[in-house]
């Protein structure tokens, strides 16, 4: 396969995004250092292309290049940042899309060892490659709930949550990523975030098994420790986080109850949810006191719950990048097929 040196160097992104997608599935966390070398490479290659085009023979090519780069940088980057601000993207997802906007503003070209065949096969009229990656990522993401539903159907699992989740035994919940799809009132897409659950358990120094063993006592604010633990970030212990399954500092008998006496107004705070969220110096992934209370109520009553692992967005992004580099723009092809492009 042949191409320009900048386009060949851009292929370094494929294994990097593949590794990031794997990390997203396994840990839901991608280190910031993953993107730094690739971002530096992206800037260098963009300047390289700009110099090549600017010293080229035609002004038309220069204008097209500038327009496409302007769309990529001026639309995809703000869009990614906006989705991150409203919670639609995680931090790693937003950084990855911003990187795509700089690394792939225009279509790369890779010539195969066959006459007149070059990848990507299907290009768009606008010619902004980062938009192609974005649209292919969205299409790949649409497949996810269909695959989840098919898996649940094959296992005989029927529920309102079957398109976005799967059932998990409650004792195993703290070893999962995602959020509960249940509240005391039934199906609820806005259930408790499991990272926030791990933070809460770490903060109060007990395991979910301890909570389930004596829910009536643990629900009382007087059962909270006077000196809570650092809640951490809710990551699993195998990913470098603090364990939320019992390997934490249990409060002593002298610690329990003292704070409840000092804060009589907290008596109407089941599970100490408000105190937990007031005590930590950062957000517990947007969790409200009521979400935490409802989630704990479900977890002490049920033996199995439905959870949504969420879409590890770097996975469809990696798939979208690979499809974009080989086939091209799937959405554009579909629109052409129905006469809309």
From Swiss-Prot:
Its EC number is 3.4.23.52. One of its GO terms (biological process) is proteolysis. One of its GO terms (molecular function) is aspartic-type endopeptidase activity. The keyword Protease applies. Residues 1, 53-64, 104-126, 325-341 are cytoplasmic. Cleaves the N-terminal leader peptide from preflagellins. Belongs to the peptidase A24 family. Archaeal preflagellin peptidase subfamily. This is Preflagellin peptidase.
């Amino acid at each position: 396969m042949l191409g320009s040196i900048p386009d060949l160097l851009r292929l370094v992104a494929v294994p990097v995004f593949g590794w990031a997608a794997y990390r997203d599935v396994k840990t839901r966390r991608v280190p910031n250092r993953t993107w730094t070398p690739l971002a530096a490479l992206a800037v260098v290659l963009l300047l390289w292309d700009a110099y090549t085009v600017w010293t080229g023979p035609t002004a038309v090519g220069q204008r097209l290049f500038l327009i496409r780069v302007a769309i990529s940088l001026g639309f995809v980057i703000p869009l990614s940042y906006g989705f991150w601000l409203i919670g639609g993207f995680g931090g790693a997802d937003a950084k990855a899309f911003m990187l795509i906007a700089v690394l792939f503003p225009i279509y790369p070209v890779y010539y195969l060892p066959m006459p007149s065949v070059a990848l990507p096969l299907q290009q768009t009229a606008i010619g902004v490659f980062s938009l192609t990656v974005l649209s292919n990522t969205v299409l790949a993401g649409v497949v996810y709930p269909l695959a989840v539903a098919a898996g649940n159907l094959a296992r005989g699992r029927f529920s309102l949550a079957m398109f976005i989740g799967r059932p998990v035994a409650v004792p195993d919940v703290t070893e999962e990523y995602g959020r509960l799809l249940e509240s005391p009132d039934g199906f609820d897409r806005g259930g408790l975030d499991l990272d926030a659950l791990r933070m809460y358990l770490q903060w109060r120094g007990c395991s979910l098994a301890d909570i389930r063993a004596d829910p009536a006592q643990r629900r009382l604010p007087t059962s909270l420790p006077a000196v809570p633990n650092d809640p951490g970030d809710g990551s699993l212990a195998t990913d470098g986080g603090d364990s939320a399954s019992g390997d934490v500092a249990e409060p002593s008998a002298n610690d329990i109850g003292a704070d409840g006496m000092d804060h009589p107004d907290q008596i109407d705070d089941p599970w100490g949810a408000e105190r937990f969220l007031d005590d930590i110096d950062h957000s517990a992934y947007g969790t409200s006191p009521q979400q935490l209370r409802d989630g704990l109520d479900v977890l002490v009553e049920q033996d199995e719950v439905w959870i949504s692992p969420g879409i590890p967005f770097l996975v469809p992004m990696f798939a979208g990048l690979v499809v974009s580099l080989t086939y091209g723009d799937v959405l554009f092809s579909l629109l052409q097929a129905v006469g809309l492009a």
